[in-house]
Every structure is written in C-alpha cells, then in structure tokens.
Amino acid sequence: MVENLHSFSVLPNLERKTSLKERFVGILLVELPIYLLYHDGTDYVVKLSLIDIWNLDGKLKILFMQKRNLLVTIVFLFIGVCGMSAERIRQNFDFDWQFRLGEQGTYKTVQLPHDWSIGLDFSEEAGPESGYLPGGIGYYKKDFTVPLSYKGKRVSIVFDGIYHKATIYLNGREIDYHRYGYTSFETDLTPYLKYGENNTLSVRVDHSEKSRWYTGSGIYRHAWLQVTDPIHVKMWGTYVTTPQVSTSSATISCVTTVANVSTSAGKIEVEQQLVDAHGNSLKINGKRYAVRTDVVIPENGTKDIEQSFSISNPQLWSLENPHLYHLEIVLKQRGKVIDRYTTRFGVRTIHFDKDKGFFLNGKNIKMKGMCLHQDAGCLGVAVPDRSYERRLTILKEFGVNAIRCSHNPPSPEFLDYCDSIGFLVIDEAFDKWKSGYYEQFFDDCWQQDISDMIVRDRNHPSIILWSIGNELAEATRKDNVGVERATMLRDFVRKLEPTRPTMLALAPAYQDKFAAVTDVVGYNYSELSYIEDRKKHPERIGLISESYPYYSGLRPYEARDYSDKNPWNYVMEYDYICGSFMWAGIDYIGESMGWPSKGWAASPFDMCMDEKPRAAYFRAAWTDKPVVKMAVVDYSIDEDPGKDHWQTPPMVHDWTFPYTDSRVLPIHTPSNCDEVVLIDPRGKKYGPRKPKDYLNNTIVWNQPYRPGKVVVIGYKGGKEVCRDSIRTSKPVATHYTLTPDRSTLKADGQDLSFISLQLFDENGVPVRINDRMVTVRVEGDGRLMGIDSGEMRRELRFDSHSLPTYFGKCQIVVQAGRIKGTLKVIVQVEGLPEQVLNIECL
C-alpha cells in the first residue's frame, strides 16, 4: 500500500457494478502502477503503460499536482458529477488513522475497526473480567481535505461504535462527547471545517475502568464521512412498517424525518419508491411502486412525512427465504435531486402467544438460540465484516435460528447479516441499570442510549424483541423502585417503537411483580421456574433467555442444583416456551475463571468457530439433516473446563489415549436417527439402539479402550443415512495441511481468509497429542491478523506471529490489503517442512 498519501476524502459512494467510467474518481500515480480510488473508499492498483486520464462528460478539473519522494499525486474533482453533486455522499473513513496509547506514546498508522487492547500483553492486574487485557486512554487522529465546493453542504462523521467515553475534536476544538460504548452516533463537522485546507479529526477514548467482560478499547467499528444538502433525510431517519401483511398483499408505510439545517424554509418533493439492490426501480407484476408528497421543511428544523402504498403478492421475509426489499427516499427541490436515502427492510409478521409460543408469518417456530458477545478471538472486538458473515453462516448451518445480542446493541453489519442470512434477533440495550458498569450512565443516558439503539435498528426484520436489561439488581427489591424503573423504560420503548414487544432477562431470583412489567419474560437458567410461574400466571409469555449448554436446574428458582437433562428438552416439552438461548454460543474473551484462562471456555464453539464434541447434541436436536456423532468422555483430558455448571464432561472426538489396561471409556453418541450401530476396533457390532430411548437422545456406549478405529452408523427407515468414525493416531505428526476458507479475497483492505492448520500422522490420521509451535509470516499487500487455537489458557499475545497448536490444530487469520496481487502466507510448524499458501487478492 502506498504510504503518506493525501487522501481526498469527500467522494461519492456508488455501487461497483456500474461502469469504470462512472465510478472512476481519481488516479494516483506511483511510478508505473496506477492507484485507482473509488467512490466507496475502496481502491486498488493496476499497471498501465501510459498515463490514462479519463474526462467524465468533459467535466474534469485538476485541483493540484504535487511531487514527493518520487510520488506524483493527481487529484481530480468532477464538477457536476461528484464534487458539485447535491446528492448524499457516504464514504468509508476507516483508513489512514494515527493512534497512540497514553500521553507518552508515539503515533502509529492504524485502520479501523481498531481495538488496541487485543494487541497488548496479558497482565494479571487487569483482572479476569477483561481476559487480563488492560484498557487505558487512547488517542486517534486523521487528516483529510474538504474542497471549497462543499461550502453550503452539511458534513458529518458517523462512528458505529467507540469504547468508550469518546471526545471528538476537529482542528483542536472539542465538538462532541459520547459516553456509551455500544451505540452509533453522528457528529456534525460543518461549523468547524476549513474548506480547501487540511483538517485534523481527533478522538480521545477513555477506557480506564473495567466492565464485566472483555469490551475491547478504541474505535472498534466502522467510521463514515457523510456530505448532504442542507435539506436531507436525517441519519437513521426512516421508519418502515408493514401494518397489513398477507400472502396476497402488504401495506408499506414509511415515516421519513427530513432535516433542514439552513436559515430558510424549503419546499421539496418527497418520493419513495421500491428499488432493487442496485438502485433501479423495482416492478412487481409490471407495476412500479412509488408515491410523492410536496412539503415545506422549516428552517433549522425537521418534519416527519408519512407515506404508504400497497404491493401485491409480497415475498415474505422468513428464516428459510429472508427476502429483503429496498425503499429509496428521493428529495427534490425545483426538479433537482438533492438527496437519496435507501432503507432495506422485510415484509413479515411476528406474534407471541401465551399458549403456543412464537409465530413468524403465522408459522409456529421454536427459537433455537445462542447468546453472543461481540468479540471474535484474536480479532478482539475490531471485527471485520467478513468475520461476522462467516460466524453467522456457520451457526445457521448448525441449526441456530435466533441470536440474543448480549448485552448490548451489535454493529449495523452484524444485523445486516442476520437479515440476509435469516435469524431472529433480540436486540439488547444494556446489561445492568443502576449497578455495575452502566450505573454511572443510567440517569443521564438511558433515554438517549435506548433511542440510539431503536432508531438505528428498527428497520431490521430480524429483530423481534427489544430487551431493556439483564439480571438486574432492581428485580429483587421488595419496594416499587424496580417496578417503576422497568415501567419507565418499557413505556419509553413502546412509544418509540410499538411493533415489537419488550423483554427483561431475569436471574433466578426476582420479585413476581417485576417480572410482570414487560411483554415477554426472559428466564435465565430457570426452566423449572418458568414452569412454576406458568401455574400462577397462565397469561405470561416467556422464553429461556440464558440456558446451560449441558446441565439444567433440578429445582425451581435454584440454578445451582442441576441434572443431566439438557435444558432444550423443556423447550420441546412445553408449547408455551418460545425458545431458548444458550450461554454462550461461542467462547469469548473475559469472564474467565482465573489465571491463566483468558475467557469463557464452556461454549459449543471455540473462538476459531470449530465445533466442539459437546456440540453434537444440539446439531442433532436443531437440524433436520441426519446426524450421528461421537464424543469420548475422559477426565484426564487437559482443557479449560469453564465455569462450574456451564461445564460439560471433558470430551474429545478422538480415540487416542495412553491407557493399556482396557479402561472403559464412555462414548456419547447424540443422534436424530431411528437407530444407531457401533463397530468397535475388533470389528464387533453393538446395537442397533434407538436414541429416543436415551436421555437427551444420546446413546452412551461404555467401551474398553483398545487402539484402532471406532465407527457409528445412523439408520432411518432401515437404511444408512450417516456415519462417524474416530481412530487411534501415531504419537508424532509427520505432516500438516493448510485449508483456507477462501483462497480469493477482495483487495479492499478489509477482507479476511481463515486458514485451518491440522496435524496428521503418517497414516493421515489427525494427531491431537504432542502439539507443535506454529510460526507465520505474510508477504505481499496484506497482514497477519493473528493466530487462534481455541485454547483459552494461551500465554502468547493475541497478535503474536507464533502459537502452539491445541489438540493438533490452529487457525491463521490474514487480511487483504488494497493492492491487487498475491498474498503469500508462509507457515513453519516446529520440526516439519515450511509451507507456502497463496491467497489471491482481486
């Protein structure tokens, strides 16, 4: 990547599928390679033998030419096409930031999303809550230029998430302050800009105090620079609802908030129309759907414009077919387009029934849910979009259909993927109220923070519930303070967004009157409590907002006494239970049980998104595909067990043990098949046995350990439909494989490849013993993001270039740069030959 470029930041955001001539904004020439900068902020290098300057419609103006260290920079402004365009500009603002940690630190170049804590040394003083990673105070700055032609426009910066207590400065002047670390916010830059000159945007981030889990530190989500006409659709200013929905027709209603920051009123035309993903008018059965309204927007004010129309034969948003529509709002003044704002939405109905649970489009659905924190292993909380997409795709294939965002609003991109992949989502405002981390903010910020979440997220069809708190201290108070506080929040949400119910997630101890406040009750680890509550309150609607992954409570209102009966069994036994959300779906940093563990290790997926043996029960229970899996229980297995009742018995998907005494080992075999047969290492068959005859549909075969191969076969209707096998490996690995999830990436500076490394013996059997040190380096325009193994007790930093395998495997994460070419990933495994993996960046 070319360093020290004067970036010309205010450029239109157009789709890449338009022609090169339409998209082309500037050419930066560095020797022979030609650096192309696109409207959306992405760019790459092509090689040209001649300087090729394109004149768009004859409206090309050369602004300046500068020579520095053999670098010739030519920046173009297309008058009437981009520079003087009155339409909205939204440009990614992630690149070329400078960052320093603390007052005495030195600035270094970083790109967003950025989490400074994930790149620090572990410190026992930082504590288990944060995964022994410190916070501190960090400083960011970025230089950018706004052309003179943008005088009279409104220029703003949107931050999708900064953790936390962010103070925003422009050219040395404090212009904004945002406390909460999980909500997006917009800051107006217009009054403080220097047009035609360099501007410096600075951000001070104060993460001095601890939270209850790993939060990360810094500008850990995307940033966007926006330019609009003084009269424009307000940021997050559309509210799309579908008040009438059937298979034959649907009514689309949209309230659009239009702002006018000028000193005179403006008469405009507001048009809304359905468009496709590329902005072209969408016709259904040959009919174009659009509606127009003439309005006057008051000076220095806003106006809400409500418009609606009906469409025939709508495609409903569902888990199987998450169809999405696009509604474009066009503002015109004197016949000229001054703003375009597109909102993606879905047409669907939701209903919670006290007796039958949850319905989507009239179809009864059990929520097969997981609670998720937002960090992603070695990436920390600075999670590129591709990581979200990969994680959710894996969970979808596993059978998950619902996500609880615990305990904060997620990134906009996360919700976009939930919409497009097909998940039900509980969007959660915060954890505690006037206790814990949020206590310092509650009185001053709760209205703003709830509003920020709802106004930003209300058009996502995946969201079905607004959660206003988790395991609240107020729930146990015998006075009315807790009830009054809960009622205050509930009423605020209902007024702001009445189409979705409200929810509170309650710990096992709570006052009955507190549980009655919200539309839906979330029971944490309290399946039997819900069953008892049902007898007293048959009108109550509820779900299991947190459940253990293996055990369940043995007595009502007592989460610390438990049985082997999996909590999911209760969900299936009682129609009125809407679903369950396992804590947690994926291992995460923080909330560790003590040094050297760096986080939560009791989930069905590790931080690499590798499925643990314990996950087999849920795969069999949550998917229609035939499943039979083996998990061998052995208490000598060296693993981080996680916290007490969230643990499972230690299991491996392997048949390599040090025993020579024919020791009996339980082989757990969850299955959704009719019958299962086991074949031991001597070839002897056992069964068939029926999973339905066993607790949790899990057959337990008690087998004496003998080296060799164990096979299980699943049958449906008397025919084999699936099988699983485990083998004894040699003690020493002789080779390894590198398997990327994708070998071709976008050269956009953001895209990722996740490379799985697996050790094998001479017979091609995976080796999980005698782990080896792995060292990685990357050549080309890209970078190593980190190495993960799923081992929470790791000693090396998350950004280390070396890490031992764990149970014979690890994962390498690399990110593309912004120059087309080949990214070479060079891997050295201790005692084995070096390998080179090529990743193409296009």
What are these regions (language model features)?
Residues 86-163, 216-219, 627-644, 650, ...:
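Extended carbohydrate-recognition surfaces in non-catalytic/accessory domains of CAZymes
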Residues 91-95, 100-102, 130, 135-239, ...:
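Accessory beta-strand-rich segments of carbohydrate-active enzymes
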Residues 108, 112-124, 173, 178, ...:
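Extended substrate-binding grooves/exosites of carbohydrate-active enzymes
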Residues 150-153, 193-198, 212, 265, ...:
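Short glycine/proline/serine/threonine-rich loop/turn segments at secondary-structure transition edges
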Residues 189-191, 306-316, 699-705, 799-818:
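Short, hydrophobic beta-strand segments
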Residues 249-296, 665-685, 709-714, 774, ...:
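Beta-strand-rich binding/interaction modules
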Residues 254-258, 330, 647-653, 667-670, ...:
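Beta-strand-rich structural segments
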Residues 266-271, 282-285, 319-326, 664, ...:
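Short flexible loop/turn segments that cap and initiate beta-strands
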